[in-house]
Design a protein with these regions (language model features):
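Lipid interaction determinants
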Residues: 8-10, 18-169
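Positively charged n-region of N-terminal signal peptides that target proteins for export
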Residues: 1-5
Length: 169
């Protein structure tokens, strides 16, 4: 009797493994949907020098919804607090430091499966010059846990910028 139970269990396992293998691979778009923690942004200058515009310990999040919307917040880990404790009464220096060390953007997105790119159609951003733009990033890595994308042509020919994320679990 035990032998039959073990044999039946092994057969069931083999069949379920075969069924799982027969399922089609998830599209890049399906894989990208979810919530991602921002790990770091790395800018590589044309001479190969690397810099980190949000520092090496930033905070942030990137959210892709199934219906094609995204929201992104990147903040340096060392953004100074406003001394007055009132966001409307900071000094020009405090506001400048915050603007240089943070970025929020939202809109819609599209994934090109063949080119392995994601295009952000920006509705609004804390850098208002981007509003209405479509910005395309190369998907360099996309696993269950990690997502890396690169903007190959950042403003002023300063090189490329890669953003690294880990999936929120």
């Amino acid at each position: 009797m035990k032998l039959r139970t073990v044999a039946a269990a092994m057969l069931a396992l083999a069949l379920s493994a075969g069924a799982a293998a027969a399922q089609p691979a998830k599209s890049l778009r399906d894989q990208i949907v979810g919530t991602w923690n921002f790990v770091v942004a790395e800018v590589t200058a044309p001479d190969g020098k690397k810099s980190y515009p949000f520092g090496e310990t930033p905070k942030g999040i990137l959210i892709f919804t199934p219906d094609g919307r995204f929201a992104q917040i990147h903040v340096a880990g060392d953004v100074p607090k406003i001394a007055s404790n009132n966001r409307l009464t900071g000094t020009p220096e405090e506001y400048a430091a915050i603007m240089r060390r943070s970025l929020s953007v939202f809109g819609t997105y599209a994934v090109d499966e063949e080119k392995k790119t994601v295009t952000y159609n920006i509705v609004s951003a804390t850098f208002p010059n981007w509003e209405g733009e479509a910005q395309t990033r190369t998907i360099d890595k996309l696993t269950e846990d990690e997502f890396v994308n690169t903007n190959a042509g950042i403003a002023g020919g300063r090189g490329s910028a890669s953003n690294f994320y880990k999936r929120v679990k």
